[in-house]
Curated annotation (Swiss-Prot):
Coiled coil: none annotated. This is Phosphate acyltransferase. It comes from Thermoanaerobacterium thermosaccharolyticum (strain ATCC 7956 / DSM 571 / NCIMB 9385 / NCA 3814 / NCTC 13789 / WDCM 00135 / 2032) (Clostridium thermosaccharolyticum). Homodimer. Probably interacts with PlsY. GO terms for biological process: fatty acid biosynthetic process; phospholipid biosynthetic process.
Length: 333
């Protein structure tokens, strides 16, 4: 298995990217292609079995227009990595760079799964009862009912493979649990999912997500991104508050020692870097978006996630599911 990694994308590239890559090579039996500017990588990269460096001369920054950047900067680390995936030279591509450019490049060069109108970002969120898949988390700010229905179908397959759940519970994000709640979009989506083969549990509210009420939560990208950032911020604040309180005086420091293992487990469970990145579900090959602020730990886990997606053949399973229920999707449009 070969995974291409964008060495130049993200706030801490290329140092933290390369550190995550080396950790992955130590732990997994895979090959990694590090795509980036060799002049900048030379001080961080050493010869390692399973590692190849592909030199590029350009980088796409976060403030560039996505479509224009991916078309103009053909020798950027992101564009070259996507091209390698398209040609079959690698099995998956991972980047912590410009989200819009990654989506645009994936759509233009690789394309969508037949039957999927819009791909979706699908991060795995930590919850009290395990984990929940959220989609879309920011790719599509304006959606039609069919888009959210398709997100639910893809999320269902992804949960089966990645969370090992036979019949995932599917929830529709809304402002209330009652069927009649919400706007015109959510009301139409409710009917589509309710009348499908999915294990639909109805509407879920913001507080339900953290409790793990649903295995998959579908929503538009505007709402999904707000949920994602809110949960990340809440987890960070709780972690900081715990540290502050436990360092307050000698007594609290002693107490922290006694409950250290428990606290460590809590912090780890709330840490988004443990869950890797967000795949672009709906693209014909595995593309994973890592958080822009990813450090080595997050990159390592995103590579682990990419490896699992390839091993579990997630994309093919989504394709087959869409083919099987194609008539239902067509009828819903």
């Amino acid at each position: 298995m070969r995974i291409a990694v964008d060495a130049m994308g993200g706030d801490y590239a290329p140092l933290e990217i390369t550190k995550g890559v080396y950790k992955a090579l130590e732990n997994f039996n895979i090959e990694i292609v590090l795509v980036g500017n060799k002049d900048q990588l030379d001080k961080y990269v050493k010869e390692e079995k399973g590692l190849t460096v592909v030199h590029t001369t350009e980088t796409i920054t976060n403030n560039e227009p996505p479509v224009a950047a991916i078309r103009k900067k053909k020798d950027s680390s992101m564009a070259v990595g996507i091209d390698m995936l398209k040609k079959g030279e690698v099995d998956a591509f991972l980047s912590a760079g410009n989200t819009g450019a990654l989506m645009a490049g994936s759509l233009l060069k690789i394309g969508r799964i037949k039957g999927i109108d819009r791909p979706a970002l699908a991060p795995i969120l930590p919850t009290l009862n395990g984990a929940t898949i959220l989609l879309d988390a920011g790719s599509n700010t304006d959606c039609k009912p069919i888009n959210l229905f398709q997100f639910a179908i893809m999320g269902n397959v992804y949960a089966q493979k990645m969370l090992n759940i036979d019949n995932p519970k599917i929830g529709l994000f809304n402002i209330g649990a009652e069927e009649e709640k919400g706007n015109e979009l959510t009301k139409q989506v409710y009917d589509l999912i309710k009348n499908s083969h999915l294990n639909f549990i109805g509407n879920v509210e913001g507080r339900d997500i953290a409790y793990g009420v649903a295995d998959v939560v579908t929503c538009d990208g505007f709402v999904g991104n707000a949920i994602l950032k809110s949960m990340e911020g809440t987890a960070s604040v709780i972690s900081s508050l715990l540290k502050q309180e436990l360092q307050r005086n000698l007594l609290t420091k002693l107490g922290a020692i006694l409950i250290y293992n428990g606290l460590k487990n809590i912090v780890k469970k709330m840490d988004y870097t443990e869950y890797g990145g967000a795949p672009l579900l709906g693209i014909k090959k595995p593309v994973i978006k890592a958080h822009g602020s990813s450090k080595s730990k997050a990159i390592f886990n995103a590579i682990r996630q990419a490896k699992t997606i390839v091993e579990m053949d997630v994309i093919s399973h989504i394709q087959r599911e869409i083919e099987l229920i194609g008539d239902d999707i067509s009828a819903a449009k």
